[in-house]
From Swiss-Prot:
A Gene Ontology cellular-component term: host cell membrane
Keywords: Host membrane, Membrane, Transmembrane, Transmembrane helix
InterPro entries with a match to the protein in the record: ASFV_fam_110 (IPR004848)
Topology within the bilayer: Multi-pass membrane protein
Job of this protein: Plays a role in virus cell tropism, and may be required for efficient virus replication in macrophages.
Similarity comment: Belongs to the asfivirus MGF 110 family.
Official protein name in the record: Protein MGF 110-13L
Lineage top rank: taxon: Viruses
Cellular localisation: Host membrane
Length: 160
């Protein structure tokens, strides 16, 4: 998947641009038939551009359907929609496990057996910048694992 499941976001963006394109063409046709002056048309186009720009924080994405991967600043809790991705290549990370009274259950895969809380589970944080995904694992050495998000590799330091 390359850092998470982005298809719903991509589809939402394509629909967003399709709706605005239809609205824009509809406005041009409306302006043509109403014989609106160019000055009025330019003001309304500027207003439409401002509205599109203001709607971007609501979409939580930059204004480009070509940029599919959002940067993820360093965090100890990956987004829920990306948890399976991060836990596949860093399966010993603490954010993949839910521990209660010393017994831990995997958050992603229900068929994983319960384990006792021990050194198998490491404190991890993650980050993603462009197509570079990183794990920061404590107290393992080496404690940083770099990989291409589109061609991920498992962290070798987890093999006991």
């Amino acid at each position: 998947m390359g850092g998470g499941d982005y298809w719903p976001i991509i589809i939402r963006h394509c629909c967003f641009y399709l709706v605005f394109s239809i609205a824009f063409v509809g406005y041009i046709v409306f302006a043509y038939y109403k014989n609106l002056h160019l000055n009025t048309t330019m003001k309304l186009i500027a207003l439409l551009c401002i509205l599109i720009w203001l709607s971007q924080p609501g979409l939580n994405r930059p204004l480009s359907i070509f940029y599919m991967k959002q940067n993820l600043p360093r965090t100890y809790t990956p987004p829920i929609r990306e948890l399976e991705y991060w836990c596949t290549y860093g399966k010993h990370c603490d954010f993949c496990w839910e521990c209660r009274n010393g017994i831990c259950k995997n958050k992603v895969w229900d068929d994983m057996p319960l384990i006792k809380q021990n050194d198998y589970i490491s404190q991890c944080s993650i980050a993603r910048y462009f197509d570079r995904c990183m794990y920061f694992i404590k107290p393992k050495t080496p404690y940083i694992h770099y990989m291409d998000c589109s061609q991920p590799t498992a962290y070798k330091g987890f093999s006991h």
